[in-house]
Amino acid sequence: LTIPLMTGISRELMKVNDHDDIASWWEVIDRTTGEPLDAAAWHYDAATESVVIDAPAAYHEYTVSFLAYLIWDPVHMYNSVINDWKDVEHQIPFDVRQPKTHAYTLRRLREYLESHPYVNVVRFTTFFHLFTLVFDELRREKYVDWYGYSASVSPYILEQFEKEVGYKFRPEFIIDQGYYNNQYRVPTKEYKDFQAFQRREVAGLMKEMTDIVHAYGKEAMMFLGDHWIGCEPFMPEFRKSGVDAIVGSVGNGSTLRLISDIPGVKYTEGRFLPYFFPDTFHEGGDPVREAKENWVTARRAILRKPIDRIGYGGYL
């Protein structure tokens, strides 16, 4: 049985990671029995980017969980697709948790603060891992989970996790029978362990950055969204992060309350819709109608729990 790995996934977005140990970080599961296959029962064909199961059982279903590189930052890809950008260099995500990247990022932050003395609020967008956002070959959104942790993994991070919890990481902790631990699932102990580990590690690195910002006499603001996995503001670890303020996109009343109810920050800001993007601001578009609808859906939430500031975002 041959299972092609990249079918239905944008090759602009991802690349199979066959550099790190496949036997350790990949998993082939017989979904009919629920049991993982021994690593000796399958192999990877790099030429076709496929996993080959040598002796599959008749009528059984099999899945492959594998590591992949994000070779185009999904938010940048989203913006490029929505705005129909042409000939734009693809921005790549990088793992700030890696020691060399960690040191480089802190140095760049200090350089920015020293060269921008007129800035009094530094807005981070965000810290450091993106939610799950996958595109298919036609650049359509294939799977989106604003709370998904699947893009926050690397062998470096997973090895640290194993040392802390004392047991072997399995891809299935995140894959979750194909449900990817979406918010309608009851999380397993292992997945909650991984979330808690990520929050602690992210909060510690956030505190390093906010301490630097404060040392230069400036406030640290966080955008609620995008690369926000591990810094969920209602979890206890966030209170140790040193963030002064929150700004987030207002889709409706519930997302406004998600911003305005955040405890422990000096002020909150809502970014109302529409974004100033060409998908709304174009010949025949009606941004006024969208703005009114957004306001009507959010205003009752403001009465119940006000935000401190209102703004808009985007670029044309």
Feature locations, PLM:
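Hydrophobic targeting/anchoring helices
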Residues: R110, R123-F127, T132-V134, Y184-R185, ...
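Polysaccharide-binding and catalytic clefts of secreted carbohydrate-active enzymes
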Residues: L1-K240
